[in-house]
Amino acid sequence: MQKRVRNRLITIIICFCSACLGISIILYNLEKNIVFFLPPSKINEIEQGQELRVGGLVKTDSINKIADDKISFVITDNIKDCEILYQGALPALFRKGQGIIAIGQLSNGKFIARQLLAKHDENYRPPQ
């Protein structure tokens, strides 16, 4: 009977240690890889051509239409500004002072966005 209890205890300890090790590995890898977006003040730390997300507020009077579907604007985190170049349809919530996340690459000091995401506040207002 005592041998049976000891074997069961050893099995439980091994399972617990394996679960702890697995959870530790998962959490370590998630910590390294989860970055929702970087503010403009942090993008100088990223090398040119690397895919990243930059987020901030669209600066007032910075929206310039270059062509029919090309636009340039500046986002800020109130520390540093970043010029964004984007070609494509703008999100419906895009406007000055709005929070934006741009997905793309940094090239010669300008951020070339391939996708724009407009952030909105948490207050839901149904259409009237």
From Swiss-Prot:
GO terms for cellular component: plasma membrane. Coiled coil: none annotated. NCBIfam families: PRK13254.1-1. Keywords: Cell inner membrane, Cell membrane, Cytochrome c-type biogenesis, Heme, Iron, Membrane, Metal-binding, Signal-anchor, Transmembrane, Transmembrane helix. GO terms for molecular function: heme binding; metal ion binding. The gene is ccmE. It is found in: Cell inner membrane. This is Cytochrome c-type biogenesis protein CcmE. It comes from Rickettsia conorii (strain ATCC VR-613 / Malish 7). Residues 1-8 are cytoplasmic. It is a single-pass type II membrane protein.
